[in-house]
Every structure is written in structure tokens, then in C-alpha cells.
């Protein structure tokens, strides 16, 4: 209450911040006549002048006012659009590294140009992040006109580009691309072996469009690059032949309850002998560093034979091992056990051993975007998540006033008892709206729910069409011109592509009915009457005669204007029956415009607000209403069964709805609870992610330092000395007598790792020799050995070998370390049962693993360099084959499973050789690529359906 009073007296913090921008807005407006009087050349020259000022010591804040005035004038001359005052404020918020919340249709894309231009003047590159390739290409071409006019370069990063094309795009002043592409390029860059191969040039400033979607909804979605391990089928089969030779009584112990198998001391000796005889043992001991993967696969083979039973845990069919679900008993084709277990089962059953994959690199969006020196974002709905955005990213959400007041009517929810009653009510509402040609967008929470609604419409005489199909749209246009409902509808789900943007843009045509899942077509405005630009682009593409084209454009313009008027007039007038003895009936008019119908509330208020926000752009009229049932997920979570009992007692009849503002408030409180819980989960998971992220940054930064150094001789020398120090300390304890030294063990290790046969026993027998003297002699011999190699092969060749071995070994051990961290993450929660904090335990264990990684790196690099034999024309180290993965947090589906997002994209020459009429010339086509037949459809929706 006191807070509300204070806000009335002094304004909210948001109001005060908006007010603080007004002096600079006034200054920009005052400059407008002066800038407008400049010639194109003089306006373009201001970019050079601004850069000179920055070079002389001026800050970006110092030149903000003239820079914004320059961009506004350039936009007027190139696009015919002028930034409103509220858009100038939005640009300032973005420049300050915060989030500008701007309602649908307020011109977020244009707003970004202000902050993008200003920050690009610094010369460090600006990244604009979009949610899909279509928007990246659209916005870079559209807004690129402004930047090009002002003498700046613009690049775009989309799927399928070569490394050279990517590097050129990142080298531009401004780069547009998707969050996926930026993240994968970062991961790939940190797997390259030279700086010249890297495509990104740093992370100075990024503006994230639809920031709530990327930084919250997809925050925990990891981007993963995996690669197949070498074909080791022979190795698995060899290991499998050892198992019958082991004695269960003496060689291993099985714990069926814990589902573990452990080798005994006797078993280890038996396995060592078998491995040595088969030529599979590296070094002397099974547990040497080189044999880590061998031990792992032996354990997996033991598990396959001892814990997994054929026809209970799996079946064998068509040369495949197929897992059986332990709960349902159903086969799960396509599912595979990880970490080599499935390969061990295949070897056990003597079927073809399929290759396994290994995670080569991964990062979450949370950790990727926090690398930027300055991060900003735009969205229509972020205020409800303001706490999380500030807590995790230190981004404040600033609500930007609309240029024109919102005229949308948001009605109270209608709550029904069952799903069937709810869908019947939605159908009736859609039919009423369609009868007056009011366009309707029905929002659903899932593809499954959208199909249910589609079936309801089909069963009631409606026909499903594709709004991207010109013939289907012409039926809709013809019906609208005749003033009759066409009874046509389209269904969209969240798979972004150009056709989808067109469908969404046409959802404002009179009589259009569109069923869409949450994110479908986000980033594309729904204009009343349809999109003039989209229609001109699609309907004139095949017209070559200029006069015919101009005539067609005029017809389209007349169509869109007439359609807009029809939609604006699609109001609903309702007569309210008077109470007994009252005055005659009153009428209630509900506005026309786009009618948003929500088929259920989502866990997040923000998603509901996004749906409502599709209507009422730039002061247009519109309506929104949610239809709910007590069987909806959110209602069930919060005790709809008790409410159902109460409504039954109150005599609520079938088909009747409850409508009351209290219901809305109760639902909002329920949503707030779910949001708070989800925030806590994300925050807790981030704490775990931070541990591996800190280690990733150390490794990646170290890699770049190594690549920057002309020579890593000093680094490998230090590693060799530290390794020898640790080795001597292990066998020659400090302050111990010479008789207590493990001289034989030290000699053996020096021979095994360094390949040096040193007279350690003789040195140890010398009178008065101390451990320091022993250490010094060993280091000197090791240094002499390396100096001899340098003399033999030459400094240049040796420097190359040192860097190659160091980088390749680091990469190999880092990948193994990632696997270990994954294993640790999966089991660390069990420590909670022992009254230990899993997070602290994870930090401690992960640190120990990281220390072990560094120690293994020293040993492995030292061992390889001491034994290295260089051949002439040493080949450049090659990166392993890679595949990119991004798992949908809702479905668990790999969104990139069928996309060709490998390190080396498809060769442009191969694509150029494709004949649209001859599928045999197409080669391998990614399922999400455009179909080579030039239909405009994705391959998976065209010829790929039959592949």
C-alpha cells in the first residue's frame, strides 16, 4: 500500500528512468533539421568523423546524440521510416546494456539500428542475435540498407556457410545470426589448431532479439558438438573374447542390487596378461594413463555379460541390439545405451558393432552470452522475468512506453469443467468470429493440442489449407472480397522458416483462422488485412513485365486496404438482458481487429502475454480471451479436483463456464508460484554449470594463448620439469633417508614415461646425495635428450611438433574430462543422502578431476615429446568429424538431428551442380535445407518425405 502511494507521488523506478532519457531525446530532435539539410555524402562522412572522435578519446556516450540523429536521418532516406521518440529511448536502453521491453509492432528491429550503429563505431564488431535464419537474413538485408548508406559493412551467419564465409561475416562491422550459429561457431573455433582458422573475433557487444526466449526458455539448452570415435569394432570384439576366460568366483564380483561389476586383484592380473598377449596393453600396468579407455571398456563388457539378459533387457533383431523398456516392456528402436555399453552388448551377441559418439565440446546459452563485454536485449514480454534476468545476466528490464496507446480488449478467462466442453466453446467462438470475418489466432501449448483443435474444426466443416499455398490463399481472399466466411484454417508449429513467416503475416486477413503453438512465427508482425510487403513479394515474383507488375501491385494495395477496413469493422455487438424491473436491454460492443484465443494458460505468464501481444499492434483494436478447463495441466497442478467438487455442489451444468476476475487473479498467483519454482531450478542448475564453465574458460583461454605463441618450448619445458619434480617427490619422500627411497620404482617410471635408462641406483648410492641433486641430474638428462632432438630435426620442425602435440593432447584429455564431469554430475545428487551438499561436493570433486587433467597433460605431453620421431612434411592436425546437437527442453528431441551442421559445410560446387529436375544429382541433402527442386519447401516436407 505504501509502495503504491509512493509510485503515485514519485513515479515508479521505470518511469523515472524513462524521464531521465528525455533531455537527450530533445537534443536529438533539435539536431534533426541540421542533419536533414546534409547531402548524402556529408551524412555518410559523419561515420568517419565519429570514428576519429573515438580514436581521439571520446566515449560512445559523448557522441550518442549526433550518432542517433544520423541513424534517424539515414533510416528516413533509405527505408522511409523515422524513429519515434520512444524508439530513441529504446535505443538508449540497448546501448546501456539492458533489456528494452517493447510491445508488438513498436518497431524493435528499427530500434536496434541506433545502438548497433553507435557501438559498431568502436570497431570491435556488433552481434545481432535472432531466433531463426529467416529473420537473420531478413533483418540484415532490411536494416543493412541503413548501415551501408552510412559506410558500414554488414554480414549474416546462417546454416551452410563455409569457414571463409563465416570469417568474412564476423569481420564486418555488424553481424546478424542465430543464437545457435554463434554458439556453435564459438565451440568450433576452440577446436581449431591455428588462429587463422578461427572465424569469430571476440565478444564485445550483442543485442539479443526475443531475449526472453533465448536467455530464459532456452537458457539451459546445451549446444553440443559430438564426433564419432574411431571404428573400434575389432577392439570390442577382442575384449569380448576375454570374458569366457574369466572366473566369476575369483576374477570379478557382481553386485546386482547396485548393478556394478568390479575386477578383483586376480582378475586385473588375468586381464593384463590377456591384453598384453593381444597387443592391446599400453605400458606395463592396466591402470596406466594410456589404458583409461581400455579399463572403461572392460568394465562395460563385464556389465554386458553379468547384468544384462537377452530377451529381458534387450532383444536381438535384424543384426541389431534393441533395448526393452523396463517399465512398459516395449521395444525402443533407435535408443542406445551410452559410454560403450551398447557396443559391448553388440559384441556379446556377435552382431555388427556400431560406432559410438563422444562429446567434443558443449556450452549453454547462459554461459555463452555471459561472455560478452556488453549484452542487451529486446522483447515484448520480459517484465515478469525481470528478477531472473537481473540475477543471472545483470540485465535490467526497462518498459518502453508505446507510441500509440494499446486498444486491445483483454477479457476474463472462461473456465469449463472438461476439455471437451472447452474445445466446444472455442469452436463456437471461432465460428462466431468467422461469421463476421474477424481473423482468429488460436494459441496452443503443444503440437498435440493444435492437432486436437484442428480435428474439431475439420469435423465441423472447416478445411485445412497451407496459407503459404497461393491457391489456398486465393480462396481466402476471394471469400473476403465477397464478404463471406471461407471456413479455411491453417496450423503452425514452432519450426521456423520463411513460409511460416508468410503464414503468420497473413493471419490478419479477413476470415483467416490460424492455430499456432507458442513460438510459431515469433518475430513477424500480424498486420490487419494482411502483409502488403509479403503479398507483393510472393505474388509478383514470376511477373517480368514492369507494367503488369505495377498493375498487380496496385491491385494488392487495394486488396489490403479493403481487407483492413473489413477487419476493423468486424466488431461484435451483444445485447445484455435487463434484470426484472430494470430499463430496456443494453448493448455491449467488443472491438474488431485480430482476435486471440488461448486454449490454455501456460506455466509462465510471459508466454500468455506473448500470445495476447500478437493483437493490438500500434494502436489497432483487438481482443484476447483464454478458454480453460479443470483438466488443463496448470489447473490440475493447483487442485482443480477440489474446485470441480465445489462447482458440482453449486449446480454448474455441462457446457456452462465460470467467468470472474477472481479466477484470473488466482491463476496468476498459481503461475507466479510455478515461475518461482522454475527460476530456482534454473538458478541451481546454473551453479553446477558454472563449475564446468569456469574450467572451460581456463582451457579455451589457454588454447588461444598457446596458438598465439610462436614457440611453446618454454611451456613444454616447464611441464617436463614439473612432471619430473612430482615423480621424484613420489618416489623420494622429503627428509627421508636414502635407504627409504624407492629407487627401483623411480627408475622404472623414468624409463616408461621418458624413455630414459638412467643410473638412478648408482646415483642414490653416492655419499651425501640429496633429493635436490637427484632431481637436478634427472632434469638435466631430460633436457639434454630434448636438446638432441632439436639439433636432429631443427628448431622450426621441433617447435611445430611441440605445439601440435600439446594442442592435440589437451583436446583429447579435455574430451575425456567432459565425460568424467558428466558422470560425476549424474551421481553427485546421491551425496545428499549422506547429509552433504551436492554442489560443494561437485565443486570439490570437479576441482580434483581438473587437477588430475593438468597432471595427465604434463605426463602425456612429456612422454610423447621425449619419444617423438618426426617425419618430413608433418601433416596439419585434422579436426575429427563433428555433428551439432540442440535438444528441445520440452520434447527432448534433437532439433538439429537432421540438419547438416558439421564442421565442414556442404561444398558450394556440389550444390551448384544440382539439377532441380534430376534428384540423382542432388547428393546428400540436409532435411532442413530448401528442397533442390526449387519448390520453396524444406526438403523434409517435399522430396525428403519419400527418402
UniProtKB/Swiss-Prot annotation:
Residues 907-937 are annotated as: Disordered. Keywords: ATP-binding, Cell inner membrane, Cell membrane, Cytoplasm, Membrane, Metal-binding, Nucleotide-binding, Protein transport, Translocase, Translocation, Transport, Zinc. One of its GO terms (molecular function) is ATP binding. One of its GO terms (biological process) is protein transport by the Sec complex. InterPro entries: Helicase_ATP-bd, P-loop_NTPase, SEC_C_motif, SecA, SecA_CS, SecA_DEAD, SecA_motor_DEAD, SecA_preprotein_X-link_dom. It is found in: Cell inner membrane; Cytoplasm. It is a peripheral membrane protein. Part of the Sec protein translocase complex. Interacts with the SecYEG preprotein conducting channel. Has a central role in coupling the hydrolysis of ATP to the transfer of proteins into and across the cell membrane, serving both as a receptor for the preprotein-SecB complex and as an ATP-driven molecular motor driving the stepwise translocation of polypeptide chains across the membrane. Belongs to the SecA family. PANTHER family: CHLOROPLAST PROTEIN-TRANSPORTING ATPASE, SECA INNER MEMBRANE COMPONENT OF SEC PROTEIN SECRETION SYSTEM. NCBIfam families: PRK12904.1, secA. This is Protein translocase subunit SecA 1. It comes from Rhodopseudomonas palustris (strain BisA53).
Amino acid at each position: 500500500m505504501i509502495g503504491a502511494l509512493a509510485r503515485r507521488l514519485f513515479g515508479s523506478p521505470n518511469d523515472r528512468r524513462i524521464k531521465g532519457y528525455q533531455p537527450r531525446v530533445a537534443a536529438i530532435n533539435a539536431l534533426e533539421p541540421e542533419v536533414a539539410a546534409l547531402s548524402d555524402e556529408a551524412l555518410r562522412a559523419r561515420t568517419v568523423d565519429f570514428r576519429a572522435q573515438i580514436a581521439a578519446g571520446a566515449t560512445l556516450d559523448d557522441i550518442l546524440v549526433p550518432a542517433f540523429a544520423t541513424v534517424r536521418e539515414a533510416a528516413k532516406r533509405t527505408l522511409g521510416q523515422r524513429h519515434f521518440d520512444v524508439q530513441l529511448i529504446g535505443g538508449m536502453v540497448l546501448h546501456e546494456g539492458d533489456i528494452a521491453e517493447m510491445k508488438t509492432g513498436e518497431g524493435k528491429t528499427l530500434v536496434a539500428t541506433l545502438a548497433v550503429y553507435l557501438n559498431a563505431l568502436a570497431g570491435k564488431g556488433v552481434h545481432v542475435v535472432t531466433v531463426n535464419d529467416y529473420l537473420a537474413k531478413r533483418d540484415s538485408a532490411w536494416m543493412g540498407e541503413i548501415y551501408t548508406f552510412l559506410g558500414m559493412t554488414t554480414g549474416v551467419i546462417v546454416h551452410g556457410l563455409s569457414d571463409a564465409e563465416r570469417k568474412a561475416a564476423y569481420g564486418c562491422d555488424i553481424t546478424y545470426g542465430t543464437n545457435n550459429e554463434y554458439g556453435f561457431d564459438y565451440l568450433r573455433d576452440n577446436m581449431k589448431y591455428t588462429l587463422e582458422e578461427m572465424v569469430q573475433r571476440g565478444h564485445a557487444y550483442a543485442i539479443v532479439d526475443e531475449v526472453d526466449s533465448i536467455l530464459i526458455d532456452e537458457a539451459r539448452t546445451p549446444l553440443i558438438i559430438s564426433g564419432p570415435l574411431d571404428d573400434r569394432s575389432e577392439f570390442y570384439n577382442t575384449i569380448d573374447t576375454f570374458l569366457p576366460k574369466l572366473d566369476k568366483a575369483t576374477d570379478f564380483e557382481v553386485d546386482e542390487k547396485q548393478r556394478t561389476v568390479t575386477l578383483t586383484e586376480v582378475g586385473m592380473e588375468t586381464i593384463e596378461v590377456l591384453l598384453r598377449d593381444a597387443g592391446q596393453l599400453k605400458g606395463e600396468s592396466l591402470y596406466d594413463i594410456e589404458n583409461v579407455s581400455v579399463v572403461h571398456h572392460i568394465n562395460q563388457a563385464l556389465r554386458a555379460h553379468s547384468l544384462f539378459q537377452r530377451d529381458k533387457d534387450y532383444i536381438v533383431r535384424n543384426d541389431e541390439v534393441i533395448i526393452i523398456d523396463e517399465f512398459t516392456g516395449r521395444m525402443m528402436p533407435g535408443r542406445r545405451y551410452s559410454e560403450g555399453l551398447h557396443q559391448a552388448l553388440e559384441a556379446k551377441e556377435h552382431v555388427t558393432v556400431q560406432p559410438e559418439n563422444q562429446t567434443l565440446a558443449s556450452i549453454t546459452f547462459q554461459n555463452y552470452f555471459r561472455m560478452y563485454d556488453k549484452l542487451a536485449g529486446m522483447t515484448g514480454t520480459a517484465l515478469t522475468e525481470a528478477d531472473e534476468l537481473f540475477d543471472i545476466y545483470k540485465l535490467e528490464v526497462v518498459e518502453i512506453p508505446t507510441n500509440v496507446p494499446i486498444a486491445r480488449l483483454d477479457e476474463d478467462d472462461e473456465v469449463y469443467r472438461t476439455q471437451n466442453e472447452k474445445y466446444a466453446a472455442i469452436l463456437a467462438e471461432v465460428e462466431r468470429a468467422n461469421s463476421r470475418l474477424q481473423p482468429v489466432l488460436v494459441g496452443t501449448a503443444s503440437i498435440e493440442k493444435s492437432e486436437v483443435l484442428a480435428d474439431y474444426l475439420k469435423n465441423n466443416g472447416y478445411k485445412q489449407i497451407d496459407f503459404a499455398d497461393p491457391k489456398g490463399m486465393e480462396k481466402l481472399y476471394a471469400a473476403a472480397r465477397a464478404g463471406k466466411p471461407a471456413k479455411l484454417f491453417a496450423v503452425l508449429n514452432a519450426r521456423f522458416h520463411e513460409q511460416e513467416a508468410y503464414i503468420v503475416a497473413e493471419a490478419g486477413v479477413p476470415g483467416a483462422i490460424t492455430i499456432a503453438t507458442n513460438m510459431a512465427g515469433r518475430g513477424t508482425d500480424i498486420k490487419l488485412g494482411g502483409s502488403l510487403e509479403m503479398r507483393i513479394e510472393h505474388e509478383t515474383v514470376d511477373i517480368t513485365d514492369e507494367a503488369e507488375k505495377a498493375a498487380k501491385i496496385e491491385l494488392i494495395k487495394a486488396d489490403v486496404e479493403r481487407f483492413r477496413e473489413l477487419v476493423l469493422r468486424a466488431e461484435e455487438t451483444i445485447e445484455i438482458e435487463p434484470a426484472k424491473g430494470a430499463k430496456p436491454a443494453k448493448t455491449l460492443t467488443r472491438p474488431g481487429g485480430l482476435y486471440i484465443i488461448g486454449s490454455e494458460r501456460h506455466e509462465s505468464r510471459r508466454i500468455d502475454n506473448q500470445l495476447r501481444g500478437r493483437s493490438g499492434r500500434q494502436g489497432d483494436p483487438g481482443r484476447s480471451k483464454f478458454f480453460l478447463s479443470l483438466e488443463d495441466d496448470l489447473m490440475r497442478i493447483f487442485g482443480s479436483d477440489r474446485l470441480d467438487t465445489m462447482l458440482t455442489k453449486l449446480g454448474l451444468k455441462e457446457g456452462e463456464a465460470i467467468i470472474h476476475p477472481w479466477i484470473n487473479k488466482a491463476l496468476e498467483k498459481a503461475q507466479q508460484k510455478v515461475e518461482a519454482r522454475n527460476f530456482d531450478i534454473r538458478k541451481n542448475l546454473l551453479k553446477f554449470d558454472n563449475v564446468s564453465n569456469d574450467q572451460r574458460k581456463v582451457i579455451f583461454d589457454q588454447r588461444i594463448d598457446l596458438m598465439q605463441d610462436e614457440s611453446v618450448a618454454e611451456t613444454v619445458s616447464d611441464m617436463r620439469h614439473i612432471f619430473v619434480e612430482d615423480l621424484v617427490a613420489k618416489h623420494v619422500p622429503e627428509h627421508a633417508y636414502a635407504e627409504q627411497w624407492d629407487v627401483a620404482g623411480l627408475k622404472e617410471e623414468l624409463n616408461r614415461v621418458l624413455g630414459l635408462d638412467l643410473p638412478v641406483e648408482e646415483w642414490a648410492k653416492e655419499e651425501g646425495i640429496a633429493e635436490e641433486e637427484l632431481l637436478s641430474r634427472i632434469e638435466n638428462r631430460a633436457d639434454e635428450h630434448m636438446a638432441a632432438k632439436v639439433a636432429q630435426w631443427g628448431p622450426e620442425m621441433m617447435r611445430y611438433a611441440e605445439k601440435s602435440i600439446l594442442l592435440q593432447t589437451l583436446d583429447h584429455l579435455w574430451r575425456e574430462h567432459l565425460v568424467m564431469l558428466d558422470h560425476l554430475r549424474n551421481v553427485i545428487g546421491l551425496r545428499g543422502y549422506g547429509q552433504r551438499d551436492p554442489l560443494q561436493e561437485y565443486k570439490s570433486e570437479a576441482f580434483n578431476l581438473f587437477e588430475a587433467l593438468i597432471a595427465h597433460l604434463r605426463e602425456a605431453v612429456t612422454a610423447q615429446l621425449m619419444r617423438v620421431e618426426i617425419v618430413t612434411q608433418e601433416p596439419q592436425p585434422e579436426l575429427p568429424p563433428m555433428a551439432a546437437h540442440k535438444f528441445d527442453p520440452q520434447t527432448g528431441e534433437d532439433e538439429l538431428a537432421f540438419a547438416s551442421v558439421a564442421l565442414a559445410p556442404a561444398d558450394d560446387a556440389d550444390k551448384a551442380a544440382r539439377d532441380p529436375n534430376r534428384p540423382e544429382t542432388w547428393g546428400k541433402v540436409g532435411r532442413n535445407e530448401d528442397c533442390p527442386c526449387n519448390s520453396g519447401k524444406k526438403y523434409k516436407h517435399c522430396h525428403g518425405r519419400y527418402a
